[in-house]
């Protein structure tokens, strides 16, 4: 599976409270969550994000509270994947469980700029920066995790098994 998209770049320690602020946790409606995604760190995000776009961030993306709402808000906003130097472990697992592809690749994060166009191949872990004509090697998903992503998350995977 591969995707193409434009980059929204963020720094270190982007926590779940800025991905989807706690004041919106009274809903599980995906569209409602998407309409508030990243608003405490990037007020223009929801107006500028397009289906297929990609979030790139430094270390410890998704730290903070263990809330499934954070990856749901990101995915529902149209983001096709998140690339970071490192992820908080619970965010990593929640993302896989809801079918949001994520990759760790420090080299890519260091070289990618906001607005760059990327192509990401999850089967190989190759990230192509189409804006700079560069390639970076991230960690490919193990086969079982790729199957979960391909089935739009853990529930879809179990249904189709």
UniProtKB/Swiss-Prot annotation:
Protein origin, superkingdom: Bacteria
Main EC class the enzyme belongs to: lyase
Entries under CDD domains matching the protein: IPMI_Swivel
Membrane spanning residue stretches: none
Biological role: Catalyzes the isomerization between 2-isopropylmalate and 3-isopropylmalate, via the formation of 2-isopropylmaleate.
HAMAP family per record: LeuD_type2
Protein name: 3-isopropylmalate dehydratase small subunit
Species, as recorded: Clostridium botulinum (strain Alaska E43 / Type E3)
Taxonomic lineage of the native organism: Bacteria, Bacillati, Bacillota, Clostridia, Eubacteriales
